[in-house]
Amino acid sequence: MRLSCPVVLLLLPCASAAGAQAAPNGYPVKPVPLADSVEIALAVSAAPPELSNQATVYAVRDGQVLTLRRGSNGSACVVARDLHGGSLYPICYNAEGARTVLARELLEVRLRSLGASEDSVERAVAAGYASGQLETPKSLAMAYMMSPRQVLFSSPRPEGRRVGAWHPHLMFYVPGATPSMFGLASEDAEPISVSGSGTPRAEVVVKVQKWSDGTPVAVPAKTP
């Protein structure tokens, strides 16, 4: 089933694609859609089956958010992408993450699918939080990125480098979090790190030692 998804992010204005200039590596490359069955399988591979088997699955096609599968446990999964060719970011959210953080994720993917520059994406996200159209979590919100099929880049910007299947990890959303709150000296500490320090989208990233299919991590990986 493919249904348009009227989430709050669709109320935000589209960011301009101006400034999305081609880089030497081919960036920006608009995401290539996958068949629905492939998209669903890839999305749910982000989390253990206990969560993902009953999760709602979304996809973004040409700026439109579609519901590929209706779930029953309040959680949600999607394959996020940026404008690096081949990027695949399977991610699943628990119920509170699906209620709040997912809207920001889909907004970013939606704008990138239309060719928006990263500066435009960041402005749209900031405006969404400032206006209240994007909500911060009221209780524990988390995401799973445990898919062995992930193809990550170190940054969504043109200078981002391909990392591939980096490391299975969990993300806990703590608006305004800073490394010092956790006794950390920097954002990229190991095995716990903080991304987006001090912002409404701050998240605590925790590495785990197995992929969602139970395969152990073979070699310790460095933070991208």
Predicted regions and their residues:
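N-terminal signal peptide c-region/cleavage motif recognized by signal peptidases
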Residues: 13-17
